[in-house]
C-alpha cells in the first residue's frame, strides 16, 4: 500500500540533504536515514549551501559596498524584503503584516512589550498549562516587569483523563476570567502533544471581550495552513528551523495585523522595543533623534538582519514555492499522518487514549482527528521501566536510531514522530512502525 501512496503523492526529497547511516555514525552504510524529526529541526535544502556561499563571496569581494551595491542580488540593506512575498502566504497574511527578524523568544518578548497593556483589573495573561518553558519565562518576566507576580498568570490545564485541551475549555476560561485578562497567548500547535488549536475560534472568543490575542506558531508554520489576517490575530511569532527548514537557530518571523501599523506616524504608534531598522527607510541613515516607524510589521525590526541567516530562510521558503505551497503539502500531510495512525492503532502494543495502561505498549497523545493536529503524533510509552529498571521509551528510541530512524524523544516517556510531506515517504512510515513493533517485541521477550 505504501508504494501506491508514494506514486500518488510526490515527494520533494531530491531538494534536501538527507543524513546517511554513515554520517549519523550508525554504520558504514551510505543509505539515507529515515528522518522523522522535522518538528525539531528540518533538513537542509540543497540550495542553502550555494545561497550562503554566494554571500560569503560578496563579502570577500565587495566588503561594505555589498550593503548598497550588490553585483548579482539584493543589496544587503534590503536583504530581507524579498522574503515577505514568500513568507506571507505561508501564514495567511498580507506582505505588510510579516517581518523576518530575530529569534522566537526574543520576538515574543518584543511583542509582549508592545501588546501586553495591563490596565485597572485587566492585568493577567491566559495561556496553557505545560507551555513550552521559554514562553512561560517570557510571560512571567513581562508581568514582573510591570510589578506583578506569577498569580497574574492563568494556565488552562487538560481535564483529568484527557491527553489534550478542548477548545470549549479554553473559551470557558477566557469568558470566566475576561474582566481580569490583558492578553491571551497560546501555541498554534502544542509542541508536546501535537494538538492544532482552533486559532480562529479562540481569537474571536477573546477579542469579543476586548482582549488582545497572540500566538506562538513555532510548530504550526510550514506544517498547517494559516489565515492570520482573516482570523484577525493581533500578533504572532514563530521560528523557521523546524518545518521551514532554515537551519539551526535560524532567523525567525513575526506577524502584526495591519490595523496596528497602517496608521503609524512620528507622533502615533504602538510602543515597542524600537531600533533603527524599524525606522522609515528614507530617513534611516540621516541619524535623526526621531523615530518614524514604517507603516508595516517591518517597524518592529530593531537591527539590520544577518545576511547569512536571511538567505538561508529565503532558500527554504523557495522550496515551499516550488512544492506548490502549504495547501498542497497539507493534503499529503493529512494522508501521511493518517497512514501512520492507522498502522500504529493496528499494533498489538497500541493502547487506546481512554484506556488505563496495564501492559507494555504506547498511547497516542495527539488528537486522532486530522483537523486537530499537524503532521506530528506523540507516543507515550508504558510502563516507565521494564523488569530490568530500564526506561522503555529510551530503549525503543535507541532501537529505532540503530536502524536509521531519527525521531525526537521527550523524557521521560514520549517519542514524537513527524512525517514531513516535503521529504518523507509512506514507505518510510511503514518501515518505522514495523521497527517500533520489533523494538517492543524485543523488550517484551
UniProtKB/Swiss-Prot annotation:
Family matches, as Pfam families: KYNU_C (PF22580)
Residue(s) carrying N6-(pyridoxal phosphate)lysine: 242
Residues the record lists as binding pyridoxal 5'-phosphate: 104-105, 132-135, 216, 219, 241, 276, 304
GO annotation, biological process: 'de novo' NAD biosynthetic process from L-tryptophan; anthranilate metabolic process; L-kynurenine catabolic process; L-tryptophan catabolic process to kynurenine; quinolinate biosynthetic process
GO terms assigned for molecular function: kynureninase activity; pyridoxal phosphate binding
Keywords recorded for this protein, A-Z: Cytoplasm, Hydrolase, Pyridine nucleotide biosynthesis, Pyridoxal phosphate
EC number, as in UniProt: 3.7.1.3
Major location (coarse): cytoplasm
A GO CC term attached to the entry: cytoplasm
Cofactor field: pyridoxal 5'-phosphate
Catalyzed reaction equations: L-kynurenine + H2O = anthranilate + L-alanine + H(+); 3-hydroxy-L-kynurenine + H2O = 3-hydroxyanthranilate + L-alanine + H(+)
Subcellular location(s) of the protein: Cytoplasm
The protein's annotated pathway: Amino-acid degradation; L-kynurenine degradation; L-alanine and anthranilate from L-kynurenine: step 1/1; Cofactor biosynthesis; NAD(+) biosynthesis; quinolinate from L-kynurenine: step 2/3
HAMAP family: Kynureninase
Subunit structure of this chain's protein: Homodimer.
Family affiliation: Belongs to the kynureninase family.
Physiological role: Catalyzes the cleavage of L-kynurenine (L-Kyn) and L-3-hydroxykynurenine (L-3OHKyn) into anthranilic acid (AA) and 3-hydroxyanthranilic acid (3-OHAA), respectively.
Record's protein name: Kynureninase
Organism: Meyerozyma guilliermondii (strain ATCC 6260 / CBS 566 / DSM 6381 / JCM 1539 / NBRC 10279 / NRRL Y-324) (Yeast)
Gene (UniProt): BNA5
Amino acid at each position: 500500500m505504501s508504494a501506491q501512496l508514494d506514486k500518488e503523492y510526490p515527494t520533494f526529497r531530491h531538494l534536501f540533504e538527507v543524513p546517511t547511516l554513515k554520517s549519523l555514525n550508525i554504520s558504514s552504510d551510505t543509505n539515507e536515514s529515515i528522518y522523522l524529526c522535522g518538528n525539531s529541526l528540518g533538513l537542509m535544502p540543497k540550495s542553502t549551501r550555494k545561497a550562503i556561499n554566494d554571500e560569503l563571496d560578496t563579502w570577500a569581494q565587495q566588503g561594505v559596498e555589498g550593503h548598497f551595491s550588490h553585483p548579482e542580488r539584493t543589496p544587503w540593506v534590503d536583504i530581507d524584503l524579498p522574503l515577505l512575498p514568500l513568507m506571507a502566504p505561508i501564514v495567511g497574511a498580507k506582505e505588510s503584516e510579516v517581518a523576518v527578524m530575530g529569534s522566537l523568544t526574543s520576538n515574543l518578548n518584543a511583542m509582549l512589550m508592545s501588546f501586553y497593556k495591563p490596565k485597572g483589573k485587566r492585568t493577567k495573561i491566559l495561556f496553557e498549562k505545560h507551555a513550552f518553558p521559554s514562553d512561560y519565562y517570557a510571560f512571567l518576566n513581562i508581568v514582573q516587569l510591570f510589578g506583578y507576580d506569577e498569580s497574574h498568570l492563568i494556565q488552562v490545564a487538560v481535564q483529568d483523563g484527557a491527553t489534550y485541551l478542548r477548545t470549549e475549555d479554553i473559551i470557558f476560561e477566557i469568558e470566566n476570567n475576561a474582566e481580569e485578562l490583558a492578553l491571551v497567548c497560546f501555541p498554534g500547535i502544542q509542541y508536546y502533544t501535537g494538538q492544532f488549536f482552533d486559532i480562529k475560534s479562540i481569537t474571536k472568543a477573546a477579542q469579543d471581550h476586548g482582549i488582545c490575542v497572540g500566538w506562538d506558531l513555532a510548530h504550526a508554520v510550514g506544517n498547517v495552513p494559516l489565515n492570520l489576517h482573516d482570523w484577525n490575530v493581533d500578533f504572532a511569532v514563530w521560528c523557521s528551523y523546524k518545518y521551514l527548514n532554515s537551519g539551526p537557530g535560524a532567523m525567525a518571523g513575526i506577524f502584526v495585523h495591519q490595523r496596528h501599523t497602517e496608521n503609524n506616524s512620528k507622533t502615533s504608534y504602538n510602543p515597542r522595543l524600537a531600533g533603527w531598522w524599524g525606522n522609515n527607510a528614507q530617513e534611516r541613515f540621516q541619524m535623526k533623534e526621531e523615530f518614524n516607524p514604517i507603516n508595516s510589521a517591518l517597524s518592529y525590526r530593531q537591527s539590520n538582519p544577518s545576511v547569512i541567516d536571511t538567505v538561508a530562510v529565503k532558500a527554504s521558503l523557495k522550496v515551499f514555492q516550488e512544492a506548490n505551497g502549504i495547501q498542497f503539502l497539507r493534503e499529503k500531510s493529512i494522508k501521511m499522518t493518517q497512514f501512520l495512525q492507522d498502522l500504529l492503532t493496528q499494533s498489538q502494543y497500541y493502547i487506546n487514549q481512554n484506556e488505563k495502561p496495564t501492559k507494555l505498549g504506547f498511547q497516542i497523545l495527539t488528537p486522532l482527528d486530522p483537523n486537530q493536529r499537524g503532521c506530528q503524533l506523540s507516543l507515550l510509552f508504558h510502563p516507565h521501566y521494564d523488569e530490568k529498571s530500564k526506561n522503555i521509551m529510551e530503549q525503543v528510541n535507541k532501537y529505532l536510531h540503530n536502524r536509521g530512524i531519527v525521531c525526537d524523544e521527550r523524557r521521560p516517556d514520549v517519542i514524537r514522530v513527524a512525517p514531513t510531506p516535503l521529504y518523507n515517504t509512506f514507505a518510510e512510515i511503514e518501515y518505522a512502525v514495523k521497527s517500533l513493533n520489533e523494538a517492543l517485541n524485543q523488550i517484551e521477550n
